[in-house]
Amino acid sequence: MEDDAPVIYGLEFQARALTAQTAETDAIRFLVGTQSLRYDNQIHVIDFDDENNIINKNVLLHHAGEIWQIGASPADRNVLATCYNKISDSKVMTCAAVWRIPKELQGGNHESPDDTSSNAQSLELLCHLDSTAHGNMACVTWEPLGDGKKLLSLADNYLLIWDLQESSTKSVLSSSATLEGKGQLRFTSGKWSPHHNCTQVATANDTAIRGWDIRSMRQIYCIENAHGQLVRDLDFNPNKQYYLASCGDDCKVKFWDTRNIHEPVKTLEEHSHWVWSVRYNHSHDQLVLTGSSDSRVILSNMVSISSEPFGHLVDDEDLSDQEDNPQEEKTKEPLQDSIIGTYEEHEDSVYAVEWSSADPWLFASLSYDGRLVINRVPRALKYNILL
């Protein structure tokens, strides 16, 4: 059973920002943001044609500055938020804004291969998330499962919740919390939990991971020294409400039960350099992607701590079949965790990995040299999970 070859797309600029187009569940579409100091930065809207194994793209100009992070609205596929650098009074500031893809490109019309970025259209600015009073933005993330009207941003040591009003053309700061402690504490990343009616978020600062209840804007747990060095990324298990994955500069990926934070449930040590990105599969949470500056992407099968640790358990209607074939009885032993694959198509640091929002068996990875690689879960494993 031969697996499909990876599909590679090259951007002309360096890049580290990648997201799936969350609200798009039919087309396989990713958004990539560039980092260039000399030229106008761009958002590449990447459509993957699964049947023909080819990539189509649109290029949109992002005049505001080099893009450090990008997040797609969960409700409107044409709306996105970016964190970007700009120079103001000879100082570099990291800001955030909400943008709309121009109407002409919303229907999935694509450039011909001869088109260049010189005639590319620009993103339409909807509103700024003005954090001037709070410092530099570290990240921005949308409320999951929401109507696209709520955003979380982290700026220096502030956790900020924004409401978008008037068709997303106005942002209002609805609540905030402050990270307090010794020294200059700064948030590095954050994630909004899809569980508990979206009332909890997790943040990382230095080596610690903290949980917050956004109703009271108070801290509800703190994992001190979660990693030996800086925590780079977080992700919530979509199917197990207390489970959280983290990765960091200690080259490790850790899995936590936030009800018992004294030690991780599981630790992976497969990367040889900083781990920048960790992502659970949205449908099959045993599938976990990680990307690292060792230039590798690793796909792990963390089935023992997944929502289906025994695989598919037997339904009552299957019992009669099993009596005829007792040797086919499904095992009740927990399945073993394993590394499914190590993907080495990149030659530079892999800063982002993302699952497709339309196809649960397809994922993309982005390295700093502007190389986007699209891969698939091996067919044998796919059928093993499904059957």
Curated annotation (Swiss-Prot):
Its main location: Golgi. The keyword Repeat applies. Keywords: Golgi apparatus, Repeat, WD repeat. It is found in: Golgi apparatus, trans-Golgi network. Pfam families: Beta-prop_EIPR1, WD40. Belongs to the WD repeat EIPR1 family. This is EARP-interacting protein homolog. It comes from Xenopus laevis. The lineage of its organism: Eukaryota, Metazoa, Chordata, Craniata, Vertebrata. The gene is eipr1.
